[in-house]
Amino acid sequence: MSLIDQLNQLEQEALAALDHAADLTALAEWKSAYLGKQGALSRLSRGLGALPAEERPAAGARFNAARATLEQALERAEAQLKRAARQHAFEADQVDVTLPGRAPAVGRLHPTTQMLRTIYTILGEMGFQVWESPEVETDEFNFQLLNMPPDHPARDMWDTFYVETASGEPTLLLRTHTSPGQIYAMRANAPNPVRAILPGKCYRYEQVTARHEMQFFQVEGIAIGERISFADLKGTLVAFAERLYGKGVKTRFRPSYFPFTEPSVEFDIECFLCGGAGCRVCKHSGWLEILGAGMIHPTVLRNGGYDPEKVSGFAFGMGPERMAMLRYGIDDIRWFFSGDERFLQQF
């Protein structure tokens, strides 16, 4: 059998074998068997050198044609198998539109946010408007305008985070309370009456415990006008507590001291966790302080642009986290900043 006849036979055999290659692995094996360096076509090409010189051109041309035919057939088979694989993957990934859909996860408001919105609603119905004030304050607004000049001993009531500033610049700090917002609200409204609440974050360098955090929310409130008395303050706070905790809630006022109010009081609610029996949250007193309050000091009124001979006013500052602890029965304020979904999903 001549070399050309052998090439014809090999070509037919290879094409027939290619038709039976069912996947890309089989194609790779076929390519190695027929077109590889040690494949059938390469072995047959070694006989070209033994042919007479006049037969070599025709045999060489047939050899090249056979290789081209097999390579083209391989490319077509490979493309066809890849298309089939893609189609199979597409069909396997198809979505059954008759299946019920998956509802997106529904988020929840943080308990502090819920409490803040409740406070806004209750006090908003009493005529208080929400104001915002800076979290980074000057020493002047955080202390001096609130009747605490430099070296005043009352400054020790707040462990303060100070901000580094250039020499000659005003002293900056992270506000220790929302009370500086009083001055902004007063100066924007004086000499007219004003009722405002000022919510926001506060910062104090304190040891973190079940009752205290270094960062916490506070809501400041002020009411200024003619003939406003302590009775108005008491009525406002009691009405607020009854709206928030129910008509039967037990409350009490205790004398206290704040440099920006005179007289000053603490407003307590009976501990809901222990029913007044005493627990670690209420320090075994049976009561939990939720806010401090008092009549605005005349000096603060003057700094806000009001004449204390003509008007008076009261102020209060409450902690939404502590109030939420009472409302939801939470025994540790650290849960509010834990980010633990097991805690947050309960609200």
Curated annotation (Swiss-Prot):
What InterPro entries does this protein's entry cite? Answer: aa-tRNA-synth_II (IPR006195), aa-tRNA-synth_II/BPL/LPL (IPR045864), Phe-tRNA-synth_IIc_asu (IPR004529), Phe-tRNA_ligase_II_N (IPR004188), Phe_tRNA_ligase_alpha1_bac (IPR022911), Phenylalanyl-tRNA_Synthase (IPR002319), tRNA-bd_arm (IPR010978)
Keyword Protein transport in annotation: no
Q: Which GO BP terms, alphabetically?
A: phenylalanyl-tRNA aminoacylation
The main place the protein resides is cytoplasm
Please give the Gene3D superfamilies that the UniProt record associates with this protein.
Answer: Bira Bifunctional Protein, Domain 2 (3.30.930.10)
* Alphabetized GO MF terms: ATP binding; magnesium ion binding; phenylalanine-tRNA ligase activity; tRNA binding
Q: What Pfam families does the database record attribute to this sequence?
A: Phe_tRNA-synt_N (PF02912), tRNA-synt_2d (PF01409)
CDD domains in the record, alphabetically?
PheRS_alpha_core
Q: So what does this thing catalyse?
A: tRNA(Phe) + L-phenylalanine + ATP = L-phenylalanyl-tRNA(Phe) + AMP + diphosphate + H(+)
Annotated localization: Cytoplasm
E.C. numbers: 6.1.1.20
Per UniProt, Mg(2+) binds at 262
Sorted UniProt keywords: Aminoacyl-tRNA synthetase, ATP-binding, Cytoplasm, Ligase, Magnesium, Metal-binding, Nucleotide-binding, Protein biosynthesis
Q: What cofactor is this protein dependent on?
A: Mg(2+)
Q: Name one GO cellular component term.
A: cytoplasm
User: Any binding details for the cofactor?
Assistant: Binds 2 magnesium ions per tetramer.
NCBIfam families, sorted? pheS
Record family assignment? Belongs to the class-II aminoacyl-tRNA synthetase family. Phe-tRNA synthetase alpha subunit type 1 subfamily.
Q: Which HAMAP family match?
A: Phe_tRNA_synth_alpha1
**Subunit text:** Tetramer of two alpha and two beta subunits.
Name this polypeptide is given: Phenylalanine--tRNA ligase alpha subunit
Instruction: Please name the source species.
Output: Roseiflexus castenholzii (strain DSM 13941 / HLO8)
